[in-house]
């Protein structure tokens, strides 16, 4: 008998799952599913407890959904990726597996694991799929057959390639001829977990699909006007579903174009499409530049920047106690919810690196440890952009003023007051510099003074980058 094994990783869904669809194409084959938890590896990669909770819930939903299709989900737990190779080999042997199907992961450790799995399964046909991207790495290259290093030409080439042939979404599998089965006992991951707001970050696949549809109908067209203002619900909040594979990027693209057909030609919805393309760009980059997965900067000379070691400043930033309200409100949102508005990710990252002169890798690590939507490629890309160490990054002399950023994107301080209750009584726009108001009003605030003076910090940071650039 032909036996197909689907190895689930970051693709916890039935709809538009390329590996699952391929495994189920042969109606006479026996189909099994496998998920391997690797807690020690997750800890090494700084997976957040909220993302672990989301994965745990999605796994249990997936197990039930697969059982309804007649596909049992086998759950195994080992320490790390190295040990998972033996588990795949063992499961294949125990179940006489003839074909293994899985969706590619592009991070360096994951790719090394998959090479070892294919090497170990000499008598099993292994098929991998580019499921977590719309266009696979290698599909969008320069005229010299190199990976693009600048986003805009990549985007233009990506759109040109997309118009030549848009990848379709594949349907969820039908019930196997053997009929539905009883699901196994519920899964509990042996990893720290933390609850989150399921209204913002849905667990069920159908709820994630509904959230996508609602955003594309009602939010994508206004995304360009609303996306930078954290007090407004102007973003999709689909990042967590994309990070764990509860949704596919193809589903996002097709739904967007169904609701906003002009998005492909620069019309309404095109700015959100740009965000999907940025996601593709960073995934393609880590495939062709695996050193990015190893905490190396893309621009080599930036590794010579003399970062400051200041645990007190790092802790103040992590806890949202820097004395800069927009930075602190953003960090408290992150710590409280496991999510942060994208504009605020740029502001807080810039502050850590260019006001505190703390190594961007400290911020990259902390974000991953807190984010429900933690994604190595996107998180690394964002941090290297803010730190001016990455490809197509902000120039090193571009340094956000945290006060003016707050005034620009949270003009009346609505977001700040939501997350900093100690500033709720500070009136109007002066909430961006509460220490000045408190001094004039003769009021004592339960809120810290700024831990650095921005103008002085800017001078110090520019000098540090200049010295590194000149090799001093």
Curated annotation (Swiss-Prot):
Effect listed in the UniProt record for changing residue 383 to F: Abolishes photolyase activity
Chain ranges of the Photolyase/cryptochrome alpha/beta domain: 2-134
EC numbers on record: 4.1.99.3
Keyword terms, alphabetized: Chromophore, DNA damage, DNA repair, DNA-binding, FAD, Flavoprotein, Lyase, Nucleotide-binding
Effect of residue 278 to X: Reduces DNA-binding affinity
Keyword Flavoprotein on entry: yes
Domain of life of the source: Bacteria
Residues spanning the signal sequence: none
Biological-process GO terms, alphabetical: photoreactive repair; phototransduction, visible light; response to light stimulus
Cofactor(s) required for function per UniProt: FAD; (6R)-5,10-methylene-5,6,7,8-tetrahydrofolate
Matching Gene3D superfamilies: 1.25.40.80, DNA Cyclobutane Dipyrimidine Photolyase, subunit A, domain 3, HUPs
PROSITE patterns in the cross-refs: DNA_PHOTOLYASES_1_1, DNA_PHOTOLYASES_1_2, PHR_CRY_ALPHA_BETA
Site, as annotated: Electron transfer via tryptophanyl radical: 307, 360, 383
InterPro entries: Crypto/Photolyase_FAD-like_sf, Crypto/Photolyase_N_sf, Cryptochr/Photolyase_FAD-bd, Cryptochrome/DNA_photolyase_1, DNA_photolyase_1_CS_C, DNA_photolyase_N, Rossmann-like_a/b/a_fold
Positions contributing to DNA binding: 227, 405
Entry note: cofactor: Binds 1 FAD per subunit.
Other facts noted in the record for this chain: There are only 10-20 molecules of photolyase per E.coli cell. Upon absorption of visible light electrons are transferred from Trp-307 through Trp-360 to Trp 383, and from there to FADH, giving rise to the fully reduced catalytic FADH(-).
Subunit structure: Monomer.
Protein name: Deoxyribodipyrimidine photo-lyase
Source organism (scientific name): Escherichia coli (strain K12)
């Amino acid at each position: 008998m032909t036996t197909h094994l689907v190895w689930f990783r970051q693709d916890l869904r039935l709809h538009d799952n390329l590996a699952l669809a391929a495994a189920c194409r042969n109606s006479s084959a026996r189909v099994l599913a496998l998920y391997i938890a690797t807690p020690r590896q997750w800890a090494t990669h700084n997976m957040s407890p909220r993302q672990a909770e989301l994965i745990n819930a999605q796994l249990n939903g997936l197990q039930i959904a697969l059982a309804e299709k007649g596909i049992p989900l086998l759950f195994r737990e080992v320490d790390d990726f190295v040990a998972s190779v033996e588990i795949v080999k063992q499961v294949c042997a125990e179940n006489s597996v003839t074909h293994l199907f899985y969706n590619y992961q592009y991070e360096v450790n994951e790719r090394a694991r998959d090479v070892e799995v294919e090497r170990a399964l000499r008598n099993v046909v292994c098929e991998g799929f580019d499921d977590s991207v719309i266009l696979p790495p290698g599909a969008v290259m320069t005229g010299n057959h190199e990976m693009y290093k600048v986003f805009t030409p990549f985007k233009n080439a990506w759109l040109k390639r997309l118009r030549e042939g848009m990848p379709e979404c594949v349907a969820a599998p039908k019930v196997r001829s053997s009929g539905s089965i009883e699901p196994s006992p519920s899964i509990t991951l042996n990893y720290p977990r933390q609850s989150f707001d399921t209204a913002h970050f849905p667990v069920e696949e159908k709820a994630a699909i509904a959230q996508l549809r609602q955003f594309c109908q009602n939010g994508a067209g206004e995304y360009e006007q609303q996306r930078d203002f954290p007090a407004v619900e102007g973003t999709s909040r689909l990042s967590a579903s994309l990070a764990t594979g509860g949704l596919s990027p193809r589903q996002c693209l097709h739904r967007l174009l169904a609701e906003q057909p002009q998005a492909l030609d620069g019309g309404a919805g095109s700015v959100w499409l740009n965000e999907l393309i940025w996601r593709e760009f960073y995934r393609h980059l880590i495939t062709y530049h695996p050193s990015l997965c190893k905490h190396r900067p893309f621009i080599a000379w930036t590794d010579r920047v003399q970062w400051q070691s200041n645990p007190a400043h790092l802790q103040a930033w992590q806890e949202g106690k820097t004395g800069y309200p927009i930075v602190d409100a953003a960090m408290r949102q992150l710590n409280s919810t496991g999510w942060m508005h994208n504009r605020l990710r740029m502001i807080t990252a810039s502050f850590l690196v260019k006001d505190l002169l703390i190594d961007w890798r400290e911020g990259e690590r902390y974000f991953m440890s807190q984010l429900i939507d933690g994604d190595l490629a996107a998180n690394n890309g964002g941090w290297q952009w803010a730190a001016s160490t990455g490809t197509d990054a902000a120039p090193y002399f571009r340094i956000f003023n945290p006060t003016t950023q707050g005034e620009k994107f949270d003009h009346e301080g609505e977001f700040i007051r939501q997350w900093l209750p100690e500033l709720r009584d500070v009136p109007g726009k002066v909430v961006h510099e509460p220490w000045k108001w408190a001094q004039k009003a003769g009021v004592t605030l339960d809120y810290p003074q700024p831990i650095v003076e921005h103008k002085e910090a800017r001078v110090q940071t520019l000098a540090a980058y200049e010295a590194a650039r000149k090799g001093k």
